[in-house]
Amino acid sequence: EMMSRVPMLSDQAAIWTDVKTAIKSRIFMMGSGADLIASINKITRLEADTQAFNSQQKAVYAQRNEHFKSIVPVFNSHKNIVCKEDECIRAETTIQNLSALKPSFREIGESGVDNLQLKYFSELSEIVHIHTAGNSPAMSDAASMTLLSSSSSSASSDYKSRGIIKEVSVVNADPMLVLSG
């Protein structure tokens, strides 16, 4: 993903920007699914904020103690920019400043998504909107690489194997829950 160059929703895809299309497809933004999951599991805003705070504190500790050794620096020769650490760790995060943030997905919920979710999850009387910019995943650029090889290829190289894939399976859940599998 390259969120700094292609911001979320900048492609104006109807599945994300047109509630009628999303409702017809039963595919929603992750935040709508997160609020639905919070509603089903009775997760409170304070619990979500506390989890976010604890996560940030663990990340700060790990970064300060150099536990992110697998991060490889990325150099941009045109702008002389070096990315060598996770830039989304927020050491200044507190429960107080998290609690002051407004829910990010209430508006899209009120535009029709909540009603559809309530139709399919009739045990719920409301969708709680607890997710904010502070307790949701950061919007960031990301890259990763996985090097896969055969056993014989690994044995003949200078790289030490870090794992073995023994089985693969595919699982899918209700698309309205988005984040559940």
Region annotations inferred by a language model:
Residues E1-I37:
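Flexible glycine-/small-residue-enriched beta->alpha junction loops
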Residues W16-R26, I130-P137, D174-M176:
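A short glycine-threonine-serine/GTX helix/turn-capping micro-motif
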Residues R26-M30, A138-S144, V178:
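Catalytic-loop motifs flanking and including active-site residues across diverse enzymes
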Residues I27-F53:
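Conserved thiamine diphosphate
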Residues E47-S152, S156:
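N-terminal extracellular/periplasmic Venus flytrap/periplasmic-binding protein-like
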Residues S151-G181:
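Glycine- and Gly-Pro-enriched alpha-helical subdomains that act as flexible
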